Amino acid sequence: MTEHRIGTQEQWQAERDELLKEEKELTHRGDELARKRRELPWVPVEKDYRFETEDGPKTLAGLFGGRSQLLVYHFMFGPPYDAGCPVCSSIADTLAPQAGHLKARDTTLLLASRAPLERLLAYRERMGWGIDWVSSGGSDFNRDLGFQYTEDELRPFLDGQIPPTVEQYARMCGTDVQGYVSEGPGLSAYALSDGTVYRTYVTTARGLEFALAYYGLLDRTPKGRDESATEPLWIRRHDEYEMG
C-alpha cells in the first residue's frame, strides 16, 4: 500500500493550478537572472593562454572559430586521470549535441581539460561525442578561473574525513583522491570584440545543474532525485550502466 497522500482528480487539479503559478513565477525569475547575467561587466582577458587543439596550438581568441561568443566547459580530466570524471561526462552527454545549435547563434561551445590532448580525444571517441575538446594543460587557464587546486589549498580537505563518493569517483578516474579533487568543474563564457577577448560569466557547483538534464527530468517524477548523502553516487558514464 502506498504511503503517499491519495486524492481525487479535483483535489489534484486545484493543487496543480496553484503549483503552476509558482512554476511560472520561477520561470519569470529565471528570465530576470538571465538578463542580469548579460548585464555583468566584461573583463578583458590579458593573459596569453595557449591551448593544444586538433588543429594545432591556439590562443583563446583562436578558439572562437570565427564567432563572437565562446562557451567553455571545464571538464574534470587532469594529467593523472585515466578517464574523465563521470559527472562531467554526464554533462558532456547533454552539451555535445547542442554545439551545432549554438553555432547557428554565433556561439562556439567546447570542452577544456588539463590532460594531454591525445588522452582527451581517445576518451571522446569512446563516449561518441561530436564536440571540440582542447587541452589547457600548458597554461594557467583552469587555475586562474578557480578550477585547479594546489596541495596546500586541498590540505584541510585531505586531512579530514574523505566522503566515500569522492573516493569512488577517484577510483573510476584511475587516480587518487588528491589527483581527483585537484580539478574542478565549471563553465566560462567569453566575448570577442575588435580583437579583444572578454570574460563575461563563470559558474561552478550547482550553477551547472542546468546541464544535468536528468535531474530536471527526475525532479518531475514521483520519487524525485531519490538520493541520500550517505549512499554511493549512482551516476556512471553512459556506457557503464547495466540496463535491464
Predicted segments — roles?
Residues 109-114:
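Short internal beta-strands
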Residues 1-105, 122-128, 132, 139-244:
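Non-globular targeting/processing and membrane-anchoring segments
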Residues 117:
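Duplex nucleic acid-engaging cores and interfaces of nucleic-acid transaction enzymes
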